[in-house]
């Protein structure tokens, strides 16, 4: 019996995927020329699976800030902020985030994953209750495991089921933290946050919204779904990431709670991880300001998302409930999902292949993430390629029948 024997089924499934084409989990970019163009295996490729929603990875001001920071502060911090102190860019980033969200406190983490891991495991523990949307991200589930709170799942995007679960708790002791996402990362659907906030007001507890995929995308100023739904006052904690709209890496949490700052000395994923390199913190501060200065990026992003969503839907692909920057097409079976992904990559379109058990309802899907930087011509080229390969593989007609 070996250490990896428990994973033999995954090993065999992984090998089977690699045996029929490129490895979708180890794609290597020979070059990346822009937010939307790269080279994969020597082929010019449209990038449609990078979560680069506003295209800010190549923003000239963000790049200049990053270069200046690395020249003046070096390549890294070599330790946590607890042990090695904070650089001015860390403090500036937290101040700008607090100002942007209109909150008293902001805390920056080294990754978005660690933000959820740290915040959730610190806020609720044994004897408390963590009420999660069933389709929550892995980082949310992992945070719940680290904190040992009782996990109660409610049906995806179902406020009535949330209320039912809370009623069942009755007068049970312990704090209650409701956790939802702004935009869900697999198929791009949006939480019914106004209704969820109403349940929270009626039944009590705290509400945390993970705005990882909705920051910079939703809301009049880009603050996310809480802003778009008009319920920011009902949201106690907002968690987000810098690796989507802001084109960097890192995570954060903002809150108005007076005691929030104690998190810095009790939150283990914050305390025992090296802090963001100065270059990353500097580029993120600049990208945040650029996002605020350019609301037209959100408009362009939403137009591009609608163009791709409408095109795929019209061809007969089984898309999500509404257009968002994440445009997923559910495939009839895993074999054709893998073949479709390989065909698109060979034709110069890179997007994400998502397979069970990581997908809603255990159905394979192709996941595209649109950018404000995509041109109409690029999206139309993607649609043409999708249609040709989907027809050749017999994907579209079975999906049309399934939709009917």
From Swiss-Prot:
Keywords: Acyltransferase, Cytoplasm, Lipid metabolism, Pyridoxal phosphate, Transferase. It comes from the Bacteria. The bacterial ceramide synthesis pathway operates in a different order from that in eukaryotes. Furthermore, phylogenetic analyzes support the hypothesis that the bacterial and eukaryotic ceramide pathways evolved independently. Involved in de novo bacterial ceramide synthesis. Catalyzes the condensation of L-serine with palmitoyl-CoA (hexadecanoyl-CoA) to produce 3-oxosphinganine. Can also condense serine and C16:1-CoA, but shows a preference for palmitoyl-CoA. Its main location: cytoplasm. It comes from Caulobacter vibrioides (strain NA1000 / CB15N) (Caulobacter crescentus). Its cofactor is pyridoxal 5'-phosphate. Its EC number is 2.3.1.50. The gene is spt. NCBIfam families: SerpalmtaseBetaP. Pathway: Lipid metabolism; sphingolipid metabolism. It catalyses: L-serine + hexadecanoyl-CoA + H(+) = 3-oxosphinganine + CO2 + CoA. Signal peptide: none annotated. It is found in: Cytoplasm. GO terms for cellular component: cytoplasm; membrane. It holds the Pfam family Aminotran_1_2. Disruption phenotype: Survival of the spt-deficient mutant is much reduced, in comparison with wild type, during stationary phase of growth, especially at elevated temperatures. Mutants are resistant towards the antibiotic polymyxin B. Mutation causes hypersensitivity to antibiotics which affect disparate processes in different cellular compartments. The modification N6-(pyridoxal phosphate)lysine is found at residue 244. The keyword Transmembrane does not apply. SUPFAM superfamilies: PLP-dependent transferases. GO terms for biological process: biosynthetic process; sphingolipid metabolic process. GO terms for molecular function: pyridoxal phosphate binding; serine C-palmitoyltransferase activity. This is Serine palmitoyltransferase. Belongs to the class-II pyridoxal-phosphate-dependent aminotransferase family. Pyridoxal 5'-phosphate binds at residues 112-113, 185, 213, 241.
